[in-house]
């Protein structure tokens, strides 16, 4: 039986849709007090009402906005025990055609946004005495590659470099830093890639199905428990075995 996280203060960036919404829902169902952030006030308000959580419109690529999130968490939640740095985007752009703006957008949200979010929340996480930072990375970049996502893959691999060094620096404050690496998870964004993409990816997964947002939420929940207190600088891959086969024939 895991220690309850009921009552703990949890911030989920990018929490209005997709994986972030799933993470927020899992924590809320387990009694945590949750603040979600994102750029769309409309999406945030709808999700907050559905899940019974607080929200604040903010852009993780902005240092000032990240500091507002920390201040809001202090006011509404009384602090931060868990930061789920989840905000991320994955627009398609082939390397030959990729613009400087494309690169800045993806790295700004996925990598810079992760660093700024953690940095802004550090004082509150340290004050918690059992602070947890949980990054949503990806199998794409750290383990695999996919055409059109060179900037995305670079941002996600960069998150893990940040995670490992941050885990060392923050250990003295009792803060752990870990990451969940989702494979293909059924979200609005993934559905938008089309039926052919989904069918192709499903056929490459040994479990022959896409993951759910709950699968990621429960991995994050575990890393937030007292039982995971001695785990830091590590990753949990949640992909149905997608990265395991040596060739397509291995799962045929």
Segments from the language model and where they lie:
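Substrate-binding pocket helix/loop in short-chain dehydrogenase/reductase
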Residues: 94-95, 102-107, 190, 201
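Short, small/polar-rich loop/turn modules that mediate ligand/substrate recognition or access, typified
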Residues: 130, 171, 176, 231-233
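Active-site helix of classical SDR
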Residues: 118, 155, 163
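Short C-terminal tail/terminal secondary-structure segment
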Residues: 232-252
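The beta1-alpha1 cofactor-binding region of Rossmann-like NAD(H)/NADP(H)-dependent oxidoreductases
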Residues: 58-68, 100, 215
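Alpha-helical segment proximal to the catalytic Tyr-Lys
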Residues: 123, 168-169, 229
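Conserved glycine-rich cofactor-binding loop
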Residues: 9, 16-18
């Amino acid at each position: 039986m895991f220690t309850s996280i009921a009552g703990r203060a949890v911030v989920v960036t990018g929490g209005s849709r997709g994986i972030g919404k799933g993470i927020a829902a899992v924590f809320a169902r387990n009694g945590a007090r949750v603040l979600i952030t994102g750029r769309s006030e409309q999406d945030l308000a709808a999700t907050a009402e559905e899940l019974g959580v607080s929200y604040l419109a903010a852009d993780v690529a902005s240092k000032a906005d990240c500091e507002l999130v920390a201040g809001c968490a202090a006011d509404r939640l009384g602090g931060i025990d868990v930061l789920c740095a989840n905000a991320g985007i994955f627009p398609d752009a082939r390397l030959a055609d990729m613009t400087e703006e494309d690169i800045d957008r993806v790295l700004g949200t996925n990598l810079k946004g992760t660093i700024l979010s953690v940095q802004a929340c550090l004082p509150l996480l340290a004050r918690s005495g059992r602070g947890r930072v949980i990054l949503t990375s990806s199998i794409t970049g750290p383990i695999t590659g996919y055409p059109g996502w060179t900037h995305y893959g670079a941002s996600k691999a960069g998150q893990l470099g940040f995670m490992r060094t941050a885990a060392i620096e923050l250990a003295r404050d009792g803060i752990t830093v870990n990451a969940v690496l989702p494979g293909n998870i059924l979200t609005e964004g993934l559905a938008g890639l089309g039926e052919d993409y989904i069918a192709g990816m499903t056929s490459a997964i040994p479990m022959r199905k896409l993951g759910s947002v709950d699968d990621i939420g429960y991995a994050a929940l575990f890393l937030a428990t007292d039982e995971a207190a001695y785990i830091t600088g590590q990753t949990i891959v949640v992909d149905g075995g997608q990265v395991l086969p040596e060739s397509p024939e291995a799962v045929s």
